[in-house]
């Protein structure tokens, strides 16, 4: 929520700036926000179909909006993928294929961010230090956390026994904490699921061309999300900064905030956004940019996701009644 950040600020001045925003640029911002999830659906479709399972793009778009909604409302964005697996299973995509596809995409999603930041560190180091300042350490921590995540996820996908060992350790811990009471019965179900999972994982390990195609799409997806802020910048009548510089600042926010276990990075994301962007505009305008940017690339997508989830549920209920 942005309310704590607005405490003590001149709300009338901020509202005046918001009312003066150019609506045509905001439409472009919204289109790029939607394109962010559509491109994710394209990646998911490529991965799933490469495993020999048909999937329509419109279904992929539905899964990505549902995933976005549940990521937004759960700590560490942990709820999206389980819900995507559930809805994909409802559409006859096996749990093994959907789980590996989503994990494979997650690895590539993180690699895409590191690839973008790698370009920044190689060619725009001065810009990096100038705008991050004493937050540079947080940027490095974010890069480190993403690297560790990629390594752990890769062990799961590319190691034959990695996922089994991790799952068994997790089961043992849950049993000790009395979360899982019937360990043997749970392990039998887990092993059956892992057999399906490994079938998909073996396929992914041998299809590197899929990796590079999806990586290209995912880099575009990341840039599409970051570009939302550029259109907001234009909507507020700002000038003097290049699109790439605005995109780099937004990418710094992503690296530094993604590591924090808050639902959607709510609160902290807004604060860090203002900290970064008040360096290229006055604080009042930065506050307005934060509200517009967050509204477009988070809350609007959440609302669409809620309608998509509700619509999917209603279609399911209607289908069940027709079969009865």
Give a label for each model feature:
Residues 20-29, 202-216:
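Membrane-interface helix starts
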């Amino acid at each position: 929520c942005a309310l704590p950040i607005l405490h003590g600020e001149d709300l009338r001045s901020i509202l005046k700036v918001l009312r003066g925003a150019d609506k045509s640029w905001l439409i472009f911002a919204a289109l790029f926000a939607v394109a962010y999830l559509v491109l994710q659906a394209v990646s998911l479709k490529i991965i799933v179909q490469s495993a020999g399972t048909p999937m329509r793009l419109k279904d992929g778009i539905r899964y990505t909006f549902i995933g976005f909604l549940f990521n937004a409302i759960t700590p560490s964005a942990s709820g999206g993928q389980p819900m995507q697996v559930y809805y994909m299973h409802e559409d006859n995509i096996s749990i093994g294929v959907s789980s590996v596809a989503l994990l494979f995409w997650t690895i590539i999603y993180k690699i895409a961010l590191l690839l973008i930041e790698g370009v920044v560190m190689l060619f725009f180091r001065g810009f990096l230090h100038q705008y991050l300042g004493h937050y540079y350490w947080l940027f490095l921590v974010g890069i480190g956390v993403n690297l560790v995540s990629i390594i752990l996820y890769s062990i799961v996908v590319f190691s034959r026994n990695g996922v089994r060992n991790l799952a068994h350790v997790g089961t043992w811990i849950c049993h000790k904490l009395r979360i899982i009471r019937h360990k043997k019965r749970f392990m039998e179900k887990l092993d059956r699921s892992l057999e399906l999972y490994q079938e998909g994982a073996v396929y992914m390990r041998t299809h590197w061309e899929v990796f590079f195609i999806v990586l290209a799409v995912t880099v575009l997806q990341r840039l599409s999300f970051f570009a939302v802020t550029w259109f907001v910048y234009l909507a507020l009548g700002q000038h003097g900064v290049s699109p790439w510089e605005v995109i780099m600042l937004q990418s710094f926010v992503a690296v530094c905030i993604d590591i924090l276990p808050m639902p959607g990075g709510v609160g902290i994301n807004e604060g860090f956004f203002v900290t970064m962007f008040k360096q290229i505009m006055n604080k009042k305008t930065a506050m307005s940019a934060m509200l517009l940017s967050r509204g477009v690339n988070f809350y609007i997508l959440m609302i669409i996701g809620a309608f998509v989830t509700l619509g999917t549920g209603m279609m399911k209920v209607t289908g069940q009644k027709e079969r009865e």
